């Protein structure tokens, strides 16, 4: 197995411990063999750091709009010795990675930011995936609605319900 260490701040989402949704995603994470992946709305970097550690062939991009989250995600990449293959960028949604295509995109999107932003992240992933790329999202509230919307946008939609969350696996 692997051991991970994370520092956080109580002002960040789930700052005192890793939340159930993120745990559900990392316990069920599907990783491509290589290439670029994205952890969008990364917070203090749990998903991206775990992915980087599990597969050293991946180049991991992480984005967040919160400067403290970006700084902390960088610290956590260093702490877990994956900083050589992790890039953490500050910015809104997909803006910091414009023009890049990813083999996989992951997120536990920030419901506190509102459904519009969550919808942009989930439905917008399609435009940022490589030809054989896929996305995995974990959603609490609004999961059923977004699952229905995703079925209009993606050719493959797998939804797993667990502990009040919906884990979505999406392929264009």
Enumerate the predicted regions with their spans.
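Class I SAM-dependent transferase core
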Residues: 1-32
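General small-molecule cofactor/ligand-binding pocket signal
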Residues: 7, 61, 87-89, 157-160
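Conserved SAM/SAH cofactor-binding pocket of Class I
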Residues: 20-98, 104-107
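A short SAM/SAH-binding and catalytic strip from SAM-dependent methyltransferases
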Residues: 103-116
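Short "lid" loop at the C-terminus of a central beta-strand within the Rossmann-like core
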Residues: 111-113, 140-145
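A short glycine-rich, Lys/Arg-flanked "PGG" loop and its adjoining helix->strand segment in the class I
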Residues: 119-131
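Conserved beta-strand signature within the Rossmann-like core of class I S-adenosyl-L-methionine
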Residues: 132-139
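Active-site capping/gating segments
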Residues: 143-172
């Amino acid at each position: 197995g692997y051991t991970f260490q994370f520092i956080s701040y109580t002002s960040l989402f789930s700052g005192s411990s890793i939340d159930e949704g993120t745990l559900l995603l990392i316990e069920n994470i599907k990783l491509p063999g290589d290439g670029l992946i994205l952890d969008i709305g990364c917070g203090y970097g749990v998903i991206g750091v775990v992915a980087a550690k599990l597969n050293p062939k991946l180049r991991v991009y992480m984005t967040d709009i919160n400067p403290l989250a970006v700084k902390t995600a960088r610290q956590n990449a260093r702490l877990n010795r994956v900083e050589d293959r992790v890039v953490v960028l500050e910015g809104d949604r997909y803006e910091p990675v414009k023009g890049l295509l990813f083999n996989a995109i992951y997120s536990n999107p920030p419901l506190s930011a509102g459904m519009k932003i969550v919808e942009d992240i989930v439905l917008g992933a399609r435009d940022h995936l490589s030809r054989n790329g896929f996305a995995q999202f974990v959603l609490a509230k609004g999961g059923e609605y977004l699952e229905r919307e995703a079925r209009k946008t993606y050719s493959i939609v797998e939804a797993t319900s667990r502990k009040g969350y919906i884990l979505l696996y999406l392929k264009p």
